[in-house]
């Protein structure tokens, strides 16, 4: 079985914030790392890329008097380096929508589904001052549903409803602020109606799809699917390949969804194995996992399946669409203009990346909106990482070195309490695997912490530091069992904190790059030589929260110097 892991493509107009990161790329990376351990790295492909077309970039370029590509070239490379080199995201392919492979794939795909595409004439907003049609975000106005006065022509940022420019109250051109007039223009539409029942059947029969995704998809289907505009009147995008569509481009959401396929193709082309890309898209032979924010559910649970079905190429529909709710920052929405939140180029200057990876997974909004607070972040790092995991590892490695010459002791006559913890190791590996494959990364990580606490309690109960003086056999059994437990704990945490887990493996005298998930069910071999103990984690200082404003001000000044033009 092949495993495709896909993260929503970040839009390059701004640096992603922590909420963006946990909703897509970080979550996808945790799952991809798990999947490689479970199924073998040769059976897993993890793809994403920079979404760089569309109206926001074009508006920005017009305002700055430069070409859109000059802006996105810089922004794409900045984000790519952050993901790969700073956040340790293990992409097999992180590409971009300006990739030639992507552009040609999109054109070929859309021509292949032309029987579901039709031309219609419609009236759209037109700015007489700027002399151009105003698609999507080129129009701003008041949301008809919630009254938000700065809603965009494609979606309201406050209530999340999808919109069209014609629905906005008091619409204005996003470039110059002039109220638009309506003019007739032709557009190409993708007809979703033939796929209503196949999508309903697919979503209702799925045993793996999260309930929030099922609910949204069925709501769309029950309301009645309609043809959706496939083309736009803006110039920054993939030229529409249809006869008579000169001057039109493909709507970014249609082409970005096809990026999951083109990125897989591009990856195997780069390896000289072009035809192998189909192995990761063939129905019945692949499980595919998509990590997105909840506002993107309709595109992934309705439009993407419809396009895959329209192709008639037996492409696999998504197995799991893991859609997070929203992450708030100290009770408020992230806002760049109001400096509310932390961005991914700021965070690594505040504390270590693995600390961020862990605490974000612990705060992952899987069932409901979650609130990032610094008080909770500090508690997670100091109590869970340092105390529950770090101190456990240090105690065990230290005692194996001190009492057994750095070798895993030989167990004899294991008691029920020893066997129970060994059994819990195997159970936890299976339970975490089950949770991860349902897209429940927070829930899975909580199970690992439970095992760490149980192992700490076991050590405290058995007290091998005392028993070694009077009952060496019992002390041997305790450290044999505890060493095997911390090996499994480190393995299960590797997808979340890869660098720190590797340090734990080094102290165990093991190579994590040669490890497989189910290997950790087997205890360590007696006589195996461990490494020397060293602190894996470090507590955040007591005055950290008190000094936070000063830290953030310093970090933001530093980051502003580094950001490329588009992202300043």
From Swiss-Prot:
It is found in: Cytoplasm. A motif ('HIGH' region) lies at residues 10-20. It is an enzyme of class 6 (ligase). Its main location: cytoplasm. Binds 1 zinc ion per subunit. The keyword Cytoplasm applies. Is required not only for elongation of protein synthesis but also for the initiation of all mRNA translation through initiator tRNA(fMet) aminoacylation. This is Methionine--tRNA ligase. It comes from Metallosphaera sedula (strain ATCC 51363 / DSM 5348 / JCM 9185 / NBRC 15509 / TH2). The gene is metG.
């Amino acid at each position: 079985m092949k495993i495709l892991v896909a993260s929503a493509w970040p839009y390059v107009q701004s640096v992603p914030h922590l909420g963006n990161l946990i909703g897509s790329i970080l979550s996808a990376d945790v799952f991809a790392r798990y999947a490689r351990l479970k199924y073998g790295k040769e059976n897993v492909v993890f793809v994403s890329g920079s979404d760089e077309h569309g109206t926001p970039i074009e508006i920005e370029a017009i305002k700055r008097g430069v070409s859109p590509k000059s802006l996105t070239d810089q922004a794409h490379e900045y984000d790519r380096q952050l993901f790969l080199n700073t956040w340790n995201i293990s992409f097999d392919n992180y590409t971009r929508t300006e990739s030639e492979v992507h552009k040609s794939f999109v054109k070929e795909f859309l021509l292949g589904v032309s029987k579901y595409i039709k031309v219609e004439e419609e009236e759209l907003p037109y700015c007489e001052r700027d002399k151009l049609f105003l698609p999507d975000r080129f129009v701003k106005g008041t949301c008809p549903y919630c009254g938000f006065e700065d809603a965009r022509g494609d979606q309201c940022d406050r209530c999340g409803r999808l919109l069209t420019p014609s629905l906005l109250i008091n619409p204005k051109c996003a470039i110059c602020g002039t109220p638009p007039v309506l003019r007739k223009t032709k557009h190409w539409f993708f007809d979703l109606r033939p796929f209503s029942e196949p999508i309903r059947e697919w979503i209702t029969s799925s045993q793996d799809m999260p309930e929030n995704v099922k609910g949204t998809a069925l709501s769309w289907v029950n309301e009645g699917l309609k043809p959706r505009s496939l083309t736009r009147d803006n110039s920054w995008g993939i030229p529409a390949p249809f006869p008579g569509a000169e001057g039109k481009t493909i709507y970014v959401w249609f082409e970005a969804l096809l990026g999951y396929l083109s990125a897989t193709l591009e990856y195997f082309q780069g390896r000289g194995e072009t035809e192998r890309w189909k192995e990761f898209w063939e129905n019945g032979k692949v499980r595919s996992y998509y990590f997105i924010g909840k506002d993107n559910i309709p595109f992934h649970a309705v439009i993407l399946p419809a396009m895959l079905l329209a192709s008639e190429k037996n492409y696999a529909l998504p197995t799991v669409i893991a859609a997070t709710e929203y992450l708030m920052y100290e009770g408020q929405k992230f806002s760049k203009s109001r400096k509310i939140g932390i961005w991914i180029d700021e965070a690594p200057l505040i504390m270590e990346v693995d600390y961020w990876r862990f605490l974000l997974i612990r705060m992952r909004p899987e069932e409901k909106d979650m609130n990032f607070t610094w008080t909770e972040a500090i508690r997670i790092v100091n109590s869970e990482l340092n105390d529950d995991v770090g101190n456990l590892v240090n105690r065990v490695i230290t005692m194996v070195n001190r009492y057994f010459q750095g070798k895993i002791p030989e167990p004899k006559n294991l008691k029920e309490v020893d066997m129970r913890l060994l059994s819990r190791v195997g159970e936890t590996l299976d339970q975490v695997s089950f949770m991860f494959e349902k897209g429940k990364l927070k829930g899975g990580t909580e199970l690992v912490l439970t095992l760490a606490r149980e192992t700490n309690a076991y050590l405290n109960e058995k007290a091998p530091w005392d028993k070694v003086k009077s009952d060496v056999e019992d002390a041997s059994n305790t450290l044999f069992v505890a060493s095997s437990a911390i090996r499994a704990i480190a393995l299960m945490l590797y997808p979340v904190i890869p660098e720190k887990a590797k340090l734990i493996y080094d102290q165990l005298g093991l190579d994590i790059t040669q490890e497989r998930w189910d290997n950790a069910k087997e205890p360590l071999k007696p006589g195996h030589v461990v490494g020397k103990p060293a602190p894996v984690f470090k507590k955040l200082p007591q005055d950290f929260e008190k000094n936070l404003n000063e830290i953030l001000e310093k970090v933001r000044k530093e980051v502003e110097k580094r950001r490329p033009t588009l992202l300043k």
